[in-house]
Every structure is written in C-alpha cells, then in structure tokens.
Amino acid sequence: MEALLQLKGIDKAFPGVKALSGAALNVYPGRVMALVGENGAGKSTMMKVLTGIYTRDAGTLLWLGKETTFTGPKSSQEAGIGIIHQELNLIPQLTIAENIFLGREFVNRFGKIDWKTMYAEADKLLAKLNLRFKSDKLVGDLSIGDQQMVEIAKVLSFESKVIIMDEPTDALTDTETESLFRVIRELKSQGRGIVYISHRMKEIFEICDDVTVFRDGQFIAEREVASLTEDSLIEMMVGRKLEDQYPHLNKAPGDIRLKVDNLCGPGVNDVSFTLRKGEILGVSGLMGAGRTELMKVLYGALPRTSGYVTLDGHEVVTRSPQDGLANGIVYISEDRKRDGLVLGMSVKENMSLTALRYFSRAGGSLKHADEQQAVSDFIRLFNVKTPSMEQAIGLLSGGNQQKVAIARGLMTRPKVLILDEPTRGVDVGAKKEIYQLINQFKADGLSIILVSSEMPEVLGMSDRIIVMHEGHLSGEFTREQATQEVLMAAAVGKLNRVNQE
C-alpha cells in the first residue's frame, strides 16, 4: 500500500542533544499508525519536523508521493495535515464556533461575518463527534475533556488527509473516548491516515492498525498491531523487560500523621479520612468527582468552608498554598505546565523555587553553591535526563518535567506529599522510575496521597484506597479488599462503604 506520508532517515540535533537519528514514519490511507516510545524518544520532535516547526538536518519527507518541505504549521495544514496537540490551543473567551473557524470566518457578500452559517457549520462538526453542546458556548465554560473535543472538531473542519493526534484521550472520560474512537473509525473509512501518539497500551490495541516504535531518537520498528502483545511492544519501547509494572513496597505504615474531619469546600462535601506515616493512600474516582478539589482544599489552594485538619496531633489551618508548605503539606499538581512549572525558567530555578529559604543567608542573598549541590543531588537521585541544570525546563520531556516537579516538592522537606496524576502523559519507562521513587519516599516515612484516574496504578501502589463520588467519600478499602469492580461501583455511587478509623 502506498503511503500518504513518508519520513525517512530524519536527523535533528539541538545544542548538547541529538533528538532524532535516522528516524522514520509511514502513514497509510484508511489506517491508524500508533507512534510510541518513552518520553524523550523523539516523537514530539518528529511531529515538529513534519509540520515545519523545526527544519530537519537530514532525511526526506514525501507527501502524496512527492518530496516536500513544509515551511511551518500553516503550510502543512493547508497541504492537508492536521494536528491535535496535547496542550490545548484554544481561546477561552471566544465561542466554540469562533475557535473552530478563527482566521477563516464565513463572510457574506457585504464582507461581514455570516454568524448563522458559521454556527450551523460548527454545530455539524460537534454533532459528528456526538457532543451534547452547541457551538455558541464559550470555550472557557467547557471541561478540559470537552475542550479537547473542540480541538478535534477544529482539525476535522480542515478536511485533512492526515490527522495527527497527540495523546488525544489524556483528559477525556470513557464516554468521550468512545465518541473519539467512533469518529476515528469514520475517518478511516473515508481513506484518511491517522497518526496516534499515546502511552495507553489498551487504546493502541483497540484503535490502531500499525505501530511505529521510537527509542532514543531512533526508529526501532514498524509492525502490525495484531502481531504484537503489550509486553512485546513495551520491551521494544524501553529496550528491556518490564517484570513488575507496579512495584509495591510491603511495609506496614506507622502512626496516624494526618486526620481530616468533615472537610468542606468548593466541590468537597463532608469528607473525613486519615493518613499514616509511611503510607500510600490512593484516591480514586471519576473525572469531576472532587478529588483534585479535595487536595487543593487540604493544601490551601481552595478555601475551606468547614471541617478540621490535624497534622501530627496539631490543628492545621491552610488559607493559602504558602500555609500548606509551611505546615509540611506539598501538592504536585495534575496540570504541571499551568500550576507546577515555569517553562521559561531553568531546571535548577524550577527545582529550588519553593525551597529558597533553605539556601538563603540572613541578609537575603542566596547560597548558590548549596542550591546547585542540592539540585545536582536530586537530578542524580531522580535520574532526570537533561544536558545541564541550566536547561530550560520547557525543553525536557514530560516524564523528566514531572520528576523535577516532584523533586521541587521534596526540597521543602514535607511530611505529607500529595501527588495528583503523577504519571499522566508519562511513558511506561519513566512511570516505573516514578513508582520506585514513591516507594523510596514511603520507606523514608513520608505520608503520600496518590490521586490517579488509572485504576491499576491506584490498586498497584496504594496501601489503602478512598473513592470519591460527587464531592463525597463513597468508599474506603484496604489493599486486600480493593478490586477494579468495587472501586468502579463506589466511583459511580452504586456502593457506599466507608470504614472510618
């Protein structure tokens, strides 16, 4: 079968880093090509070379059989290559229709915007995706999952021959994911080629026909998905066997460290639970259940309206994140790019940002040598892949950014570490490293709250699990009691079992 798009022998280097070396990718009509690899394997760089954001150092790009070079995203888009980025590219203050047709609005014969036609066309695109809202709604009023669907509608509006989807289901619910897969199958039947970049093995085996594997910037293999197993695909990605996906540390927790009684706040209603020293408490639930809101109330990022929190026997009041940090509670956000990291700053500056008091002299000046030593130690301990600590953190892969975010939290020497979706957007190899770090923190007596939408992760890593449903606690289970079935039953409100200590 002749490929719609072919990239062969692609090289791309940056100062101190060879991002791509002999990389290759084929996209076929009517087929979904998965592009997989650990974070830092070169997937994003390849997409930027393809769409003309980066100029390739070597190699060829064939589009519809002809050698081509795109000068930027506009030229690749006009040629018929659409891309849906992992980071949303929408304007919250505009309506859905205005976002979809931004820069190419429908105009009438008087040169004025034809709003009626524009909204009608946008509504048709939303209907194709089986969405329940109209296109006159403001994008800022939508959930992250619904905003992602608007991004997909925007690309569909270009009638692209090849559509690149970068982690498209990262923020989608199961229902939204099913809608997306239905649309992908429709696009396949129309002869379009799709590049599907994802870390989610289940999705790759469900929706993709072929898979291309990258490792360390190099092309490893192109295979039909049907010829592979999850294990064999992961082994190709990481270059080694993954014996134990979730390395649980079997060590009994200590005394109660954190006690939460009848906590209320925005999206949180009357929640009570305990957390022990050296314990990993998993927090499960569906999107919108109030898990993140609970953590933010606890940490001080959202206001507490009632309830009590005690830490090591002393009552704690957190009116701001600064109060949370001062009391030894650290929150690592699920949205590391918005809440967690300053992308234009260096690895060193990001890592030490909240711990500068430990590196400050009485007069306020910094002990730079101490700061550099601490950052260097964490880079080594966490195996952060970066050319130097002065590298801008925005240039690191997702897994390495997440390690820096966690290291920054630990630099403040916390008693309670809240990890909200710590492995979201992180590849299988980096996930294992993060799990091993979590176990190390547990062994050191740190109390950890692990919020995750991935049930196997919660089940595999936690000593005890609480489940949220519509702002309430709907279940509490020991490691032995917990199964995917009971967690899901509690998450949808069908089961209510809370064992308070």
Swiss-Prot record:
Its EC number is 7.5.2.7. One of its GO terms (molecular function) is ABC-type D-ribose transporter activity. SMART domains: AAA. It catalyses: D-ribose(out) + ATP + H2O = D-ribose(in) + ADP + phosphate + H(+). Keywords: ATP-binding, Cell inner membrane, Cell membrane, Membrane, Nucleotide-binding, Repeat, Sugar transport, Translocase, Transport. Part of the ABC transporter complex RbsABC involved in ribose import. Responsible for energy coupling to the transport system. Belongs to the ABC transporter superfamily. Ribose importer (TC 3.A.1.2.1) family. This is Ribose import ATP-binding protein RbsA. It comes from Escherichia coli (strain UTI89 / UPEC). The gene is rbsA.
